[in-house]
């Protein structure tokens, strides 16, 4: 199962988050305080092809807000963590970064034809993606 440490790694580690994160409560506090923009950049570097990063970033946080602020709002930080969590879970299931990325960007029939990366932008969508990925843990087709 994916641990918070794997999520923290995709957020850029303690340096990317801007504070030490030794527990899930520390990660929650960092999200509520607002993650630095670099945390989103780290997630996108892993999860998105270079040509798609700016578009996905602008779906997480409006372009003007991203350029104006050094820290994300708690709401945008939560979305960033959600993307990192889903990406970390895909990485854990496939044990291969390229295959994990391919899963995130390919429309999936169990997500009503949506791409997992798009579904993960909302809390309920992320839960759906996690359910699909959980099937892979049990050897079912993903």
Where in this protein do the model-derived segments appear?
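Non-transmembrane "mature" sequence context
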Residues: 1-142
